């Protein structure tokens, strides 16, 4: 089952010729979701071929570089005769402000746009085999991050062991893998735990939006396959990072290390690094044992299962 992240906007508050403002597109099989929607996001979606068929948009906070692309995107969806509803999620208490922006700049789209308030710890999406959970972050506006967390998968079926126990190839294999005991012709009962391994973890992708480093992020991002973290500045601007409620690359790397994340994507890169983000990447590499990288706009990352 595919899980893929496309970085649509990786710049800080100011866009550059190389990087747009904040937006991340996530596709999990047929589910398409957008995390933040900075100015120009719809053009990035056109450039990088994601399409507009998103069903949900998760907004971390209501600063312009995270929301000003939403009215234009909704207007284009409307021009394209969209009928399917769009659910938009914002920090609790901010619904009216976002609705005002939509109504003022996009008019009233002809398709349903549901604006929902979200609180820390809330399960925003509860699907059959994954959920999206909100968590509080530390910025100078009410802000949330979001984590996509897949359910555990069945353990591996040990065909060789099943055959040793006398289980005939066929439907009984499927029954055992589904967690059902089976009875053989001689009356022997084979239990699933005899031939099925321990449950295997699903995947986890965590997006912080703008934030200072927090213990809450460490908890949510534990064993994350991909942590997408604010890394606006390098350490030589640590005071500015603290003053503006952002993180340095080293701070993001420390969070990823403490969470034992597998990969760290450094985003919301200040325009001062527009020509050369290597100080950000190098700083994170020095502090994080996993893979740390500064994605370019348009980069797509496939998320394999942890045991692959």
Swiss-Prot record:
Its EC number is 3.1.26.11. Binds 2 Zn(2+) ions. It catalyses: Endonucleolytic cleavage of RNA, removing extra 3' nucleotides from tRNA precursor, generating 3' termini of tRNAs. A 3'-hydroxy group is left at the tRNA terminus and a 5'-phosphoryl group is left at the trailer molecule. InterPro entries: Metallo-B-lactamas (IPR001279), RibonucZ/Hydroxyglut_hydro (IPR036866), RNase_Z/BN (IPR013471). SMART domains: Lactamase_B (SM00849). SUPFAM superfamilies: Metallo-hydrolase/oxidoreductase. GO terms for molecular function: 3'-tRNA processing endoribonuclease activity; zinc ion binding. Zn(2+) 2 binds at residues 65-66, 210, 268. Pfam families: Lactamase_B (PF00753). Its cofactor is Zn(2+). Zn(2+) 1 binds at residues 61, 63, 139, 210. Keywords: Endonuclease, Hydrolase, Metal-binding, Nuclease, tRNA processing, Zinc. The active site is at residue 65. Belongs to the RNase Z family. Zinc phosphodiesterase, which displays some tRNA 3'-processing endonuclease activity. Probably involved in tRNA maturation, by removing a 3'-trailer from precursor tRNA. Homodimer. This is Ribonuclease Z. It comes from Natronomonas pharaonis (strain ATCC 35678 / DSM 2160 / CIP 103997 / JCM 8858 / NBRC 14720 / NCIMB 2260 / Gabara).
């Amino acid at each position: 089952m595919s899980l893929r992240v496309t970085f649509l906007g990786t710049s800080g508050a100011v866009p550059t010729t190389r990087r747009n403002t904040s937006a991340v597109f996530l596709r999990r099989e047929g589910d398409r979701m957008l995390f933040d929607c900075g100015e120009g996001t719809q053009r990035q979606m056109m450039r990088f071929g994601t399409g507009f068929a998103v069903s949900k948009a998760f907004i971390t906070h209501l600063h312009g570089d995270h929301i000003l692309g939403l009215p234009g995107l909704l207007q284009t969806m409307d021009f394209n005769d969209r009928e399917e509803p769009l659910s938009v999620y914002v920090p609790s208490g901010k619904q009216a402000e976002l609705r005002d922006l939509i109504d003022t700049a996009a008019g009233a789209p002809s398709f349903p746009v549901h604006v929902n308030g979200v609180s820390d710890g809330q399960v925003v999406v509860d699907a059959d085999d994954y959920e999206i959970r909100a968590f509080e972050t530390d910025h100078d506006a009410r802000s949330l991050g979001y984590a996509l967390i897949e359910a555990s998968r069945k353990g591996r079926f040990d065909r060789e062991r099943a055959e040793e126990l006398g289980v005939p190839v066929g439907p009984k294999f499927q029954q055992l893998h589904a967690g059902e005991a089976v009875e053989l012709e001689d009356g022997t009962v084979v239990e699933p735990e005899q031939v099925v391994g321990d449950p295997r973890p699903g995947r986890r992708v965590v997006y912080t939006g703008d934030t200072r480093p927090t213990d809450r992020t460490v908890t949510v991002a534990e064993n994350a396959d991909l942590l997408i973290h604010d890394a606006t500045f390098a350490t030589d601007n640590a005071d500015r990072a603290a003053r503006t409620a952002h993180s340095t690359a080293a701070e993001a790397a420390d969070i990823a290390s403490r969470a034992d994340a597998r990969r760290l994507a450094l985003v919301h890169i200040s325009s001062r690094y527009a020509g050369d983000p290597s100080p950000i990447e190098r700083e994170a590499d020095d502090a994080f044992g996993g893979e740390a990288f500064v994605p370019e706009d348009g980069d797509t990352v496939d998320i394999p299962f942890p045991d692959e």
